[in-house]
Amino acid sequence: MISFESDYNNGMLPEILEALGKTNSEKTSGYGFDPYSESAKEKIRKAVDNENAEVFFLIGGTQTNTTVIDSVLMGCEGVICVETGHIEVHESGAVEAFGHKVITLPGENSKLTSSTLSAYMDTFLADETHPHMVQPGMVYISMPTEFGMVYTREELTALYATCQKYNLRLFIDGARLGYGLVSEACDYDLPFLAKHCDVFYIGGTKVGAMMGEAVVFSGMKAPKYFFTNIKRHGALLAKGRMLGIQFDTLFTDNLYFKISRHAIAMATRIHSIFQKHGIAIAYDSPTNQQFVVLSPSLYDALSKKVAFEIWERKSDTEIICRFVTSWATKEEELDELEHILQTL
C-alpha cells in the first residue's frame, strides 16, 4: 500500500544515515557540545545571515514549542495564536500544562493577520481590568500553517511590526519550514524570515531528519537558563551529536532546500492528479500538504489501497482528507495513485 499519511513516516535521508554510520564509533562530548553540533550551528548562522544568532538543538516539535514559550514568557503571560494553531489543536495542552494560556484569535485562511492582532490588543489594553487578566506576551504562528498556507512578505512584515508595537515576541514554528520557503507562494528567503521574528525553529523531523529541531534566536537573546530549560522540558538529547550530525548534513550543499523542492514537486503533481479526476480541492495549499474533498464511498474505496488521513468530516457527504509528500515520495507512487483513481 502506498502512503501519503505524513512527512515523517520514513526513517531519514540516506545522506544522514550515512553520516551517522560513519561517525558511529567516535567518542564526543554529550548534550550538543561536540564538533558536529558546532559545525551545524555555524552553517545555520550563515544560512540565516546572522553571525550572532543563537542556535540550540531539541529532540521534537512539541518539546520545542513548550520550551521556547515557557522560557520566553513570564508566569502570568500567555501566547496568542489562531484558532487552528498547532499548539491549540494538536499538542495535547502541552503549552498550558506549563502554565501559559493559549489565547486564540480567528484566522484568515489559517493565518493570523496584523489587523486582527492589533484590534485584539487595543481592546485588551482598553479594558481597565486587564491587569487582572492573563497578559499577552508572545505571538505564535507556524510557517507554513496547519493548512499548508504560506505567509507573504507583506503579511510577515506587518505582523512583526505589530508585535513590536505591543511589545510581543514573535515565535515562528518551522516544523515544515523548508516546504514553506521553497513554495511558489513564498516571496522571501530564510534570512528575511529570521529578521522578521524574535525566535523560530528549523524543522528536521518532518524535513528529512530522523528527529530534531533547530531553535534559532535571531531577533532576541536566548533567555537566561535556556539550555537548562531544554533539559527541564525533556527536550535535551544526551547523545547530542546525533542531532548535530543531522543538521550539519541538512545544511551541507543546500540539501535541506533540495529535498523540500522535491516534496513540493510531488505535492503539485498530487494536486493535479486530483483535479484531473474531478476531485475538489479543500484548501489551495502551495506546500507539501494537500487537502481534498472525498465522498464517503470514494473514501472507503481509496483508503483500502492508499494510506492517508482524515482531516475533517465536513458533512455526511464530504470528508476532507490530507495527502502529504516528503523527500521520500517517489514518482512511481504518484503513478500508482493515479492508476488507482482511474479504476475506482
Task: Report residues per predicted region.
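Conserved N-terminal alpha-helix of the aminotransferase class I/II PLP-enzyme fold
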Residues: 13-61, 83-88, 94
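PLP-dependent aminotransferase-class I/II
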Residues: 99-137, 141-144, 151-158
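Active-site C-terminal subdomain of aminotransferase-like
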Residues: 135, 142, 150, 187-286
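Conserved C-terminal alpha-helix-loop-beta "cap" of PLP-dependent enzymes
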Residues: 75-76, 268-269, 273-342
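Catalytic PLP-binding core of fold-type I/II PLP enzymes
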Residues: 151-183
